[in-house]
């Protein structure tokens, strides 16, 4: 990892109001909602055990993602996975996303977890370059999904991935 960056993983229940405010600032660069709307989304969608991933540069949060505990069916077998959501950075073209996702990938590998993420088509090349695999529409059933689906750290073949919980 680049020495000018550091990454911290926080369980949601351990976040301070100050850190939540900093997260919302970074998220608002990507998604143009009000502070209160971002805060309400976090309160409604992130559980106490879910993880916030923060990339710091000069003691300032410059990129963010969250890891949410999810259950996914692979060919009818339910497996505990981590949903990777809200990947964003305070500025583009600074390498923040690369650093952040490199650490997310290391976390998934070291914790023996499969990662699932949803992204816009324009981001497929970025995530593929980091080892994520794009799922073809015939490989998954995810209601209301309007984005692309990708997996990471999946060592087995499967015919059908089913996920029926909230999008993250």
PLM region descriptions:
Residues 1-4, 8-13, 48-49, 118-168:
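Terminal substrate-recognition subdomain of acyl/acetyltransferases
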Residues 3-5, 80, 85, 113:
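Short amphipathic alpha-helical segments
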Residues 12-88:
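A conserved beta-strand-loop-helix scaffold within acyl/acetyltransferase catalytic domains
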Residues 88-92, 120:
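Residue-level recognition of the GNAT/N-acetyltransferase active site
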Residues 94-106:
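Conserved acetyl-CoA-binding loop-helix of GNAT-fold acetyltransferases
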Residues 106-120:
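Conserved GNAT acetyl-CoA-binding A-motif
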């Amino acid at each position: 990892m680049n020495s000018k960056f550091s990454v911290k993983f926080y369980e949601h229940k351990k976040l301070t109001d100050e850190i939540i405010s900093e997260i919302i600032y970074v998220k608002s660069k990507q998604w143009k909602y009000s502070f209160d709307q971002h805060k309400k989304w976090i309160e409604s969608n992130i559980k106490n055990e879910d993880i916030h991933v923060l990339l710091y540069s000069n003691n300032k949060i410059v990129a963010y993602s969250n890891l949410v505990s999810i259950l996914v069916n692979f060919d009818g077998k339910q497996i505990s996975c981590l949903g990777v959501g809200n990947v964003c950075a305070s500025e583009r073209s600074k390498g923040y996303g690369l650093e952040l996702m490199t650490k997310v990938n290391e976390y998934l590998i070291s914790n023996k977890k499969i990662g699932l993420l949803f992204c816009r088509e324009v981001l497929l090349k970025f995530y593929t370059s980091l080892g994520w695999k794009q799922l073809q529409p015939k490989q998954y059933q995810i209601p209301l999904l309007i984005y692309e689906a990708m997996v990471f750290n999946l060592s087995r073949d499967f015919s059908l991935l089913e996920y029926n919980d909230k999008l993250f």
